[in-house]
Amino acid sequence: MEFILSLVGSLLLIICVLVSVAFLTLLERKVLGYIQIRKGPNKVGLMGIPQPFCDAIKLFTKEQTYPLLSNYLSYYISPIFSLFLSLFVWMCMPFFVKLYSFNLGGLFFLCCTSLGVYTVMVAGWSSNSNYALLGGLRAVAQTISYEVSLALIGFKILLFSLL
């Protein structure tokens, strides 16, 4: 019974995160519309609330294209793996109701975020384009350099909270 409750809680958490991302993009589009003095996405329905759902329908009905010389499987698996990694990060966050009890939640966070580097590298490599490979390697170098500073800042916060 406890397994089913944790599974339902995890599924509810993932759905809430995905819906909140959709409405954060709506907020971003509204702010950009006001900054650029244009109408923005608030013309669909009541205050633009159905806009993220219309965007999702448009996204799912688009034609899928892929480079002819790409490694098909790794080209499509790497973004899906990146999405799952970013959703796994939310599992270690402390909520009012504990879904999963992590003693080393900070380490789990660092591991999940550092594995995201490999998805970018595989996506750049699998397209069989030199420009995509160079862009992927550049993104990997940037991500690794930012992760080192993030880990040091987290370690500093942890160290000062124990004192």
UniProtKB/Swiss-Prot annotation:
Alphabetically ordered keywords of this record: Electron transport, Membrane, Mitochondrion, Mitochondrion inner membrane, NAD, Respiratory chain, Translocase, Transmembrane, Transmembrane helix, Transport, Ubiquinone
A biological process (GO) annotation for this entry? aerobic respiration
**What parts of the sequence cross the membrane?**
3-23, 77-97, 104-124, 143-163
Q: Which reaction does it catalyse?
A: a ubiquinone + NADH + 5 H(+)(in) = a ubiquinol + NAD(+) + 4 H(+)(out)
Its record classes its membrane topology as: Multi-pass membrane protein
Q: What is its EC number?
A: 7.1.1.2
InterPro entries on file: NADH_UbQ_OxRdtase_su1/FPO, NADH_UbQ_OxRdtase_su1_CS
Pfam families named among the record's database cross-references: NADHdh
One cellular component term from this protein's GO annotations in UniProt: mitochondrial inner membrane
Q: Name one GO molecular function term.
A: NADH dehydrogenase (ubiquinone) activity
Name where it's found: Mitochondrion inner membrane
Task: Give the first-level EC class, as a single word.
Answer: translocase
Please give the family membership noted in the entry. Answer: Belongs to the complex I subunit 1 family.
| Annotated function | Core subunit of the mitochondrial membrane respiratory chain NADH dehydrogenase (Complex I) that is believed to belong to the minimal assembly required for catalysis. Complex I functions in the transfer of electrons from NADH to the respiratory chain. The immediate electron acceptor for the enzyme is believed to be ubiquinone.
**Which PANTHER family does this entry report, sorted A to Z?**
NADH DEHYDROGENASE SUBUNIT 1, NADH-UBIQUINONE OXIDOREDUCTASE CHAIN 1
Q: What is this protein called?
A: NADH-ubiquinone oxidoreductase chain 1
The major lineage groups are: Eukaryota, Metazoa, Ecdysozoa, Arthropoda, Hexapoda
